[in-house]
């Protein structure tokens, strides 16, 4: 019997076609001279490597000695856990494989391992794991595998049954020796300096590469692990790092010390939004919205094969990193990879000047998921630009520069930084000039000694040093509790490093006030709309009282509808004084930035205060006097929640006689204007960092009221003071004159009555037809419910009626004191401050306070000098600054307290749809699994289509094609030219959006030049609200160009083929927000540029002003003659063309010209629904089919309904149809649903139908949501009682 032959060796795993055709990222081999400066070299290769997303750099020097590397690694591991005897490190378990039960196949489980390894132990563990993995894949361990073989096996294992590997990641430390203390020699001395022996002696040493010269991260005030200091990574075979993008879209530098290779995959930044959409659909099952997709990708647990990306039209590339090589990832590029075996590497971030182009957008996207910012890109820009400006260094961080080197060696990065610095200061100057049109001042914060070197040079020597600021550089969730811990009160109740809110004593608050001087550094004053940390200037907006009253009684939908109406104010009684088209704010000449401006001052011991105190109320020194009178004349609203008071007084005379006053504590809480503490909620939530509060809310905690009421006491007089005190106060109201002209209120205070009763003794109304005069007398017996009485009777006599017109409830609602949420102060960047002020102007107006850094005037002066040196011309506006006094500092404290509050639906910024944090938290709700709640900033940052936006058709972009198919190039990525039909729809849309942006730029420039000589009218603030572009543009051009505020209603019909309509279409495009993927950075093609130049020249020729006025007839005749001349010119051109033709072709052309007749215009085909009772029609059959299947055909919605009737009602959501109007006289609100109108009517009628039947409670509620919340929080449930009885 023959022995059986030995088993044949397994054949090599076939490489799939998608992997074989995957582009390879570029590899660069710099010379020793190029390798000297890492930032300059990365900036040099960035234009060629950024379209790949990643690249490899092979250094010209050998790696450090292995002995020194192992020694440095051991010291780093020992520093992680000093208690351990051996230098060990922890690991994490990672799953490789596919679990069929998971609804989100892209998410891989990761959990912390209980084992700790030294480096040799983990190397042996990695070897054993490699053998078991290859055995499971039917490969012998002795066989040598190529990088492609590793990739094939990894993706095959990812689709097979789950296996577990270990990975040591995110460990602070480095394998390089510490950097030398002495600075690098200047460039002119480098040739004579000693040459570096190995990589550790160069500027590419990972311990200091983040703070190398030219990197913006060198100006970060404190070290952040993984960003400014390196982190170590130790892996084994198939240890993976998930798809992710760097924090703030920074560059990253990754070095491999030793071991097996790593495979990297990269997606360029231009395709980032398309990548996220593919991950959402294929990796997460399409059950999350784009915002949650971005947040989930930030958790670094998403692994998905590049095969899915390639099939979806996403550019993707690969590279293999070996020991001793660097991998550079560029801003905004997604990347992932895995290890081929045991290896050890480290990574750190850098920031070249090119990062500044996209830093703003990256900060907005980070703020959209409520992640705290680690750095302000404006701060880094200012520090780097000013460090280049000054010749003499203020400390050791800046380099000395000779004038000769500066003239001869002007780095491209330096020029870019200086231009962006000047552009940013110019934009701030332009916006400040528009916000300060009324002659007010910009408040300068007190100086803080903790700034960058460039800003420290600007400080004068006599400024005092302040307390050290709180670092806002939180790099992980683990650091968040530590940061909040240092900001919370200690056991003794003293608050450290925060502004005290427990006292009104200014002497006690002085230290806390001074601690607020570094607000712009601490990141506490970030824009509510976009989340940007404004480094130089911020604006604080607070709605006026009339605006706040309207915001209290309206919902967000009605407000947005009213804001969309152009011209006029919503409130008839809104005091909107205008001067030269600019909102006139109630400022005085001495204090121009008042936030709380009272119309009249009342003494604390006035009769109004005494009477209010007699009714159990708390006298408020800052309360409006008219509101005090209303509280007195209409009883105690809190005691009668079901009553509805109709009041309309303009002038009021009140006289009171007080026999005795006593101090009595009040059982009611009043709103606190000057101080507040965070009392509600779980322990440990008291923190100065608002991002921690937003994080608490996102985890399910929602505070009842972030502001607790504080009691105010009234000083009591001695009992022996029995003399009568009378005083008469005349108050002029600012509201409508509906009721009486004058009112006399007589108050007598006596003691002895203990009952609480409200009885009308006498009411007489006498009127004469001639004089229209009448008298009303009311005697009301009022007694307090506690201790002793305050008033025996109140007599109100009314005379001199203007008419018999009844007083309306709308006036009573307009005089109610606004609540905290409707009058809260919010911080905005200057750009969004103008937009928000325009919105508030439509419903009553707002008050503004502008705050800037103490050195900002000098920064502006340096920008002027730098602009003159670079030859940039700009007409600088004069800005008036003033030092912050104690009153301004109190307001800044109030701003900080308001910023601490967790946003709720009653916040006025939420109702206007401009609160980024609220929208981000709302997007986490299960109601928004597939579609985000609309927020203009978030939609723009994540490339989503606005519900109200539709594409604009451009005749200028059309070119008649005969039979040749139009070929559109989408872009060039990963070394390949991609057509529009080969890429993802997000990328295919880039050409259209690029043309729209180009048309926007041309038209804005054209119309700005046209109206440059005209005076600035009502649109001055609108013109100033142009979006501050993150990309570098010509400063002279950007200073003259002002766009329109997006979001306005535009005409989206297809215009006719005429030159005037072309201009109209371009003008429309300048106002429409064209939804496009964020981060588009393609160069404009020559075709678009040429067409833009031709169109621009045509418009400039047409706008030449006429030398003399002409009549309409002459204009028409000249227009007709111009058309005639154009026709003659066209005929002449056609005739010359015919003469050049051969005789036969000429005859055929003439015959065709005679026979040719104009074709009728094509009509759009509509597909109507034939279901009974439905009259809807659609453009495509697909939409009609979905509609008949009771599925919403609107893109991004796709909701399914049980009947066609509900689908027709759902249409109101997209069309914003509001057929139901409020029947109350004077109210213009409209509603989509009947229940919404029913609940709104209760605001007018005062009806509170929901009563809590819990013994001892008896609270009433107006809305069922409030009643449900009350039962849920207190446990007062009727069902529990029924169960208990049964």
UniProtKB/Swiss-Prot annotation:
Question: Where is the protein situated, by its record's location annotation?
Answer: Nucleus
Q: Which UniProt keywords apply?
A: Chromatin regulator, Dioxygenase, Iron, Metal-binding, Nucleus, Oxidoreductase, Plant defense, Repeat, Stress response, Transcription, Transcription regulation, Zinc, Zinc-finger
Q: How is the cofactor bound?
A: Binds 1 Fe(2+) ion per subunit.
Gene deletion effect: Reduced plant height, panicle length, spikelets per panicle and spikelet fertility. Increased susceptibility to the bacterial pathogen Xanthomonas oryzae pv. oryzae.
Domain JmjN residues, every copy: 25-66
Start and end residues, zinc fingers (C2H2-type): 1167-1189, 1190-1214, 1220-1244, 1250-1276
Recorded superkingdom: Eukaryota
- Give the required cofactors: Fe(2+)
Annotated JmjC domain ranges read 201-367
Quick one: a GO cellular component term? chromatin
A GO molecular function term, named singly, is: histone H3K27me2/H3K27me3 demethylase activity
Ligand binding (Fe cation): 244, 246, 335
The keyword Kinase appears for this protein: no
- Main location as per UniProt: nucleus
> What tissue expression does the UniProt record report for this protein?
Expressed in leaves and flag leaves. Expressed at low levels in roots, shoots, stems and panicles.
Q: What does this protein do?
A: Histone demethylase that demethylates 'Lys-27' (H3K27me) of histone H3 with a specific activity for H3K27me3 and H3K27me2. No activity on H3K4me3, H3K9me3, H3K27me1 and H3K36me3. Involved in biotic stress response. May demethylate H3K27me3-marked defense-related genes and increase their basal and induced expression levels during pathogen infection.
**Protein name, entry field:** Lysine-specific demethylase JMJ705
Q: Provide the taxonomic classification.
A: Eukaryota, Viridiplantae, Streptophyta, Embryophyta, Tracheophyta
């Amino acid at each position: 019997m023959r022995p059986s032959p030995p088993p044949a060796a397994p054949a090599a795993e076939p490489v799939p076609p998608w992997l074989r055709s995957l582009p390879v990222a570029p590899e660069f081999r710099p010379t020793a001279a190029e390798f000297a400066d890492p930032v300059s070299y990365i900036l040099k290769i960035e234009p060629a490597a950024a379209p790949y997303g990643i690249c490899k750099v092979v250094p010209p020097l050998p790696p450090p000695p292995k002995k020194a590397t192992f020694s440095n690694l051991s010291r780093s591991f020992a520093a992680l856990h000093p208690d351990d005897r051996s230098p060990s490190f922890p690991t994490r378990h990672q799953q490789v494989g596919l679990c069929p039960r998971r609804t989100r196949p892209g998410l891989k489980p990761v959990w912390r391992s209980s084992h700790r390894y030294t480096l040799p132990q983990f190397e042996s563990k990695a070897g054993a794991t490699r053998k078991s993995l290859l055995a499971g894949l039917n490969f012998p361990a002795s066989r040598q595998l190529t990088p492609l073989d590793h990739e094939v096996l990894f993706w095959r294992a990812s689709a097979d049954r789950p296996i577990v590997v270990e990975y040591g990641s995110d460990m602070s430390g480095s394998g390089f020796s510490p950097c030398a203390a002495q600075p690098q020699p200047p460039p002119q001395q480098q040739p004579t300096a000693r040459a570096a022996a190995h990589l550790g002696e160069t500027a590419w040493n990972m311990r200091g590469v983040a703070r190398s010269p030219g990197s913006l991260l060198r100006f970060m005030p404190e070290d952040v692990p993984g960003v400014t200091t390196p982190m170590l990574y130790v892996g084994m075979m198939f240890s993976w790092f998930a798809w992710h993008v760097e924090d703030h879209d920074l560059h990253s530098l990754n070095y491999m010390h030793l071991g097996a290779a790593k495979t990297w995959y990269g997606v360029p930044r231009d395709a980032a939004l398309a990548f996220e959409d593919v991950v959402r659909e294929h990796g997460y099952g399409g059950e999350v919205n784009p915002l949650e997709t971005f947040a989930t990708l930030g958790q670094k647990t998403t692994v998905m094969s590049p095969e899915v990306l390639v099939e979806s039209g996403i550019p993707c590339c690969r590279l293999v990193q070996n020991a001793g090589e660097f991998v550079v990832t560029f801003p905004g590029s997604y990347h992932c990879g895995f290890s081929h075996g045991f290896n050890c590497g480290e990574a750190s971030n850098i920031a070249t000047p090119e990062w500044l182009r996209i830093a703003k957008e990256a900060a907005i996207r980070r703020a959209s998921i409520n992640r705290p910012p680690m750095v302000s890109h404006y701060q880094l820009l200012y520090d780097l630009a000013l460090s280049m400006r000054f010749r003499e260094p203020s400390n050791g961080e800046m380099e000395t520069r000779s004038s000769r080197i500066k003239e001869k060696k002007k780095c491209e990065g330096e020029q870019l930084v200086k231009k962006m610095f000047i552009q940013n200061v110019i934009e701030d100057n332009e916006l400040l000039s528009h916000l300060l049109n009324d002659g007010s001042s910009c408040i300068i914060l007190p100086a803080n000694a903790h700034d960058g070197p460039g800003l420290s040079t600007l400080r004068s020597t006599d400024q005092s040093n302040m307390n050290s600021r709180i670092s806002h550089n939180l790099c992980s969730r683990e650091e968040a509790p530590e940061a909040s811990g240092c900001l919370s009160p200690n056991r003794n109740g003293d608050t450290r490093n925060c502004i005290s809110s427990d006292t009104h004593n200014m002497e006690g608050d002085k230290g806390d006030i001074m601690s607020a001087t570094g607000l712009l550094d601490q990141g506490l004053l970030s824009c509510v709309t976009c989340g940007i940390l404004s480094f130089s200037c911020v604006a604080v907006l607070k709605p006026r009282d009339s605006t706040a009253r309207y915001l209290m009684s309206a919902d967000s939908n009605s407000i947005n509808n009213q804001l969309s109406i152009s011209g006029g104010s919503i409130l008839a009684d809104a005091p909107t004084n205008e001067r030269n088209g600019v909102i006139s704010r109630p400022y005085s000449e001495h204090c121009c930035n008042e936030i709380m401006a009272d119309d009249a001052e009342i003494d604390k011991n006035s009769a109004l205060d005494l009477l209010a105190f007699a009714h159990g109320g708390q006298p408020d020194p800052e309360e409006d006097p008219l509101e005090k009178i209303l509280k007195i004349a209409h009883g105690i609203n809190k005691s009668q929640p079901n009553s509805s008071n109709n009041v309309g007084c303009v002038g009021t005379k009140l006289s009171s006689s007080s026999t005795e006053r006593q101090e009595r504590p009040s059982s009611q809480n009043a709103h606190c204007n000057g101080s507040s503490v965070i009392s509600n909620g779980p322990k440990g939530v008291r923190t100065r960092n608002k991002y921690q509060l937003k994080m608490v809310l996102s985890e399910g905690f929602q505070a009842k009221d972030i502001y607790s009421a504080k009691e105010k006491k009234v000083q009591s007089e001695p009992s022996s003071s029995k003399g009568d005190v009378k005083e008469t106060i005349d108050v002029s109201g600012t509201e409508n004159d509906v009721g009486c002209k004058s009112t006399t209120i007589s108050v007598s205070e006596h003691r002895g009555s203990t009952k609480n009763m409200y009885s009308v003794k006498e009411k007489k109304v006498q009127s004469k037809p001639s004089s229209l005069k009448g008298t009303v007398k009311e005697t009301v017996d009022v007694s307090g419910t506690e201790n002793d009485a305050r008033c025996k009777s109140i007599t109100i006599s009314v005379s001199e009626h203007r008419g018999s017109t009844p007083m309306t409830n709308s006036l009573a609602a307009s005089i109610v004191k606004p609540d905290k949420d409707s009058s809260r102060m919010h911080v905005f960047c200057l750009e969004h401050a103008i937009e928000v002020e325009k919105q508030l102007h439509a419903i009553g107006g707002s008050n503004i306070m502008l705050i800037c850094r103490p050195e900002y005037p000098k920064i502006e002066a340096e920008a002027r000098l730098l602009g003159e040196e670079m030859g940039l011309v700009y007409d600088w506006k004069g800005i008036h600054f003033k030092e912050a006094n104690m009153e301004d500092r109190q307001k800044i404290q109030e701003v900080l307290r308001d910023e601490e509050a967790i946003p709720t639906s009653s916040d006025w910024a939420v109702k206007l749809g401009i609160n980024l944090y609220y929208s981000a938290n709302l997007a986490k709700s299960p109601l928004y699994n597939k579609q985000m709640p609309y927020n203009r900033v978030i939609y723009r940052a994540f490339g989503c289509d606005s519900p109200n936006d539709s594409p604009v058709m451009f005749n200028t972009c059309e070119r008649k094609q005969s039979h040749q198919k139009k070929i559109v190039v989408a872009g060039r990525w990963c070394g390949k030219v991609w057509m529009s039909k080969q890429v993802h729809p997000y990328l295919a849309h880039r050409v259209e959006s690029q043309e729209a942006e180009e048309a926007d730029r041309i038209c804005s420039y054209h119309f700005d030049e046209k109206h440059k000589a005209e005076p600035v009218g009502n649109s001055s603030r609108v013109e100033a609200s142009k979006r501050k572009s993150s990309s570098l543009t010509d400063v002279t051009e950007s200073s003259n160009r002002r766009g329109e505020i997006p979001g306005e209603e535009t005409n989206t019909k297809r215009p006719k083929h005429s030159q005037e309509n072309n201009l109209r279409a371009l003008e429309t495009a300048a106002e429409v927000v064209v939804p496009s993927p964020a981060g588009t950075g393609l160069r404009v093609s020559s075709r678009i540029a040429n067409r833009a130049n031709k169109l621009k020249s045509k418009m400039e020729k047409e706008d030449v002003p006429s030398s003399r006025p002409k009549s309409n007839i002459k204009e028409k005749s000249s227009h007709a003659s111009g058309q005639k001349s154009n026709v003659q010119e066209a005929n002449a051109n056609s005739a010359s063309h015919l003469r050049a033709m051969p005789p036969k072709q000429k005859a055929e052309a003439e015959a065709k010209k005679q026979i040719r007749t104009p074709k009728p215009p094509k009509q759009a085909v509509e597909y109507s629904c034939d279901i009974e009772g439905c009259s809807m029609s659609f453009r495509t059959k697909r939409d009609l089919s979905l509609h008949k299947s009771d599925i919403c055909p609107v893109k991004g919605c796709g909701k399914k309904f049980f009947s066609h009737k509900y689908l027709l009602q759902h249409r109101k959501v997209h069309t914003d149809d509001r057929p139901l109007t409020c029947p109350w006289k004077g109210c213009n609100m409209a509603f989509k649903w009947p229940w919404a109108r029913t609940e709104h009517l209760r605001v007018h009628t005062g009806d509170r139908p929901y009563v809590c039947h819990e013994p001892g409670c008896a609270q009433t509620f107006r809305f069922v949501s409030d009643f449900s919340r009350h039962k849920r929080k207190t446990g007062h449930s009727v069902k529990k009682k029924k169960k208990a009885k049964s």
